[in-house]
Amino acid sequence: MIEASKLKAGMTFEAEGKLIRVLEASHHKPGKGNTIMRMKLRDVRTGSTFDTTYRPDETFEQAIIETVPAQYLYKMDDTAYFMNTDTYDQYEIPVANVEQELLYILENSDVKIQFYGSEVIGVTVPTTVELTVAETQPSIKGATVTGSGKPATLETGLVVNVPDFIEAGQKLIINTAEGTYVSRA
């Protein structure tokens, strides 16, 4: 059992017959009354997200999640296809369940598939990835790192804020936890 006050982003637990992943969690102390936990959660099976609050002392059954190394193969219609790199088993995951993760991976990228029992529930991407800039405003001569930056669309469709000197076609290192530019590759 785990208390609501100990839940952090990325953890998975069971509540009301649902398998739920924490996307965001924060303590909130209203002016009057007891502390509450505000959380943004995702139902792992359906992919739907919702906001809720819990008392810090509420307890939940923590889900035991196993991970296996895998490779992203391709996406067709509403399904993403992955292959276990140890056993070569292939897995189909609804795009709604891995929509955010697909913004950070290309075909043949290495990932980790998450299992709850024998059920595939999600994908973990590396902490940083290398992606190419597909489209951005032209760079400004004399631009420095200290500028406010500009939006750039990457090859996966992800939009990140980058320094003014970045041009289309350049490879960038992206932090997948925050969805931010780290450096040029």
Curated annotation (Swiss-Prot):
Transmembrane segments: none annotated. The keyword Cytoplasm applies. It is found in: Cytoplasm. CDD domains: S1_EF-P_repeat_1, S1_EF-P_repeat_2. One of its GO terms (molecular function) is translation elongation factor activity. It holds the Pfam family EFP. InterPro entries: Elong-fact-P_C (IPR015365), NA-bd_OB-fold (IPR012340), Rib_uL2_dom2 (IPR014722), Transl_elong_fac_P/YeiP (IPR020599), Transl_elong_KOW-like (IPR013185), Transl_elong_P/YeiP_cen (IPR001059), Transl_elong_P/YeiP_CS (IPR013852), Transl_elongation_fac_P (IPR011768). PANTHER family: ELONGATION FACTOR P, ELONGATION FACTOR P (EF-P) FAMILY PROTEIN. NCBIfam families: efp, PRK00529.1. Belongs to the elongation factor P family. Involved in peptide bond synthesis. Stimulates efficient translation and peptide-bond synthesis on native or reconstituted 70S ribosomes in vitro. Probably functions indirectly by altering the affinity of the ribosome for aminoacyl-tRNA, thus increasing their reactivity as acceptors for peptidyl transferase. This is Elongation factor P. It comes from Streptococcus pyogenes serotype M4 (strain MGAS10750). The gene is efp.
